[in-house]
C-alpha cells in the first residue's frame, strides 16, 4: 500500500530524477544508465504522469493552496503513480532513476518525500527544442494541451490565443526551465546538477555520471556518446538556423534572458 511505502521511503536509496522540457535525450540517458550496476533506469514508466504533471503546474501556479497543502496533494499523486517502482527499488536494493520529463513539476514534492533524491536539470537550445516541438505538432490539436503545460487561464487569455505555435512552444521552454531554476535555488549543490544537452561531450558526461554516483565504464560512455536515439529528421527550412528572422525574434522575446543565462545565442 501507499501507507506502507511512505513508512519505508527512507529505504529508497539515492534515487535520481531528471527535470526537463522533454526532447532532451531522456531516452538516451535511460539507455545509458540501464547498464549501470545497482541502478534501475526508466524512460517512460507507466503511468507517465503527463496529465498529472500539467495539473501539478496548474495547482502551484494558481496558488489557491498553501505550499504545504499543494505539496501534500502532489505527493499523494506522485506516490500513487510510482508506488510499485519505488517499492521495487528498496526491496531489490536497486537505485531508482527516472528520466521522464513529466515528473518535472512534481520536483518540490519529490525532494520533500525523498530526502536522498538527486536531481539533474537538462536544458537544450530553445531554437532546437521549438523545432522539435513543431515537428511533433505540439499545440496544433487538443491532445497536446493535455500533455503540455499551458497558462492557467489560457482559454480566456487573448495573448495566448494570438500566439503562433512557435511562440507557444517557446513559452513552454521558458516556463518549464524557469520553474526548474526556482526549484534549484532551494536545494544544496550536492542534490542538483545542471547539464547542457546542446553541447554534450565526454567531459560533461563524466561530470553527470559522477554526480549520480553510478559506475559506468569509459568504454560504455564512449560507445554511448556516438549513438542517437529518438531522433527526428528535418528539412533545411525546418532547422532553427534557417528560420525567418521574424520567427527567431518571436522566440527571443520569450526565451531571453534565460537563454542568455545558459549561454545560448538566439
What residue ranges belong to the model's regions?
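PAPS-dependent sulfotransferase catalytic core
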Residues: 1-84, 227-228
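Hydrophobic/aromatic beta-strand patches that form the interior of the parallel beta-sheet core
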Residues: 16, 40, 118-120, 193-195
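Short His-Asn-centered micro-motif
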Residues: 19-21, 97-101, 123-124, 197-198
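PAPS/PAP-binding and catalytic site of the sulfotransferase fold
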Residues: 25-38, 110-114, 134, 192-216
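Conserved phosphate-donor/acceptor-positioning beta-strand/loop module used by diverse small-molecule
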Residues: 113-136, 198
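Long, charge-dense
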Residues: 135-162
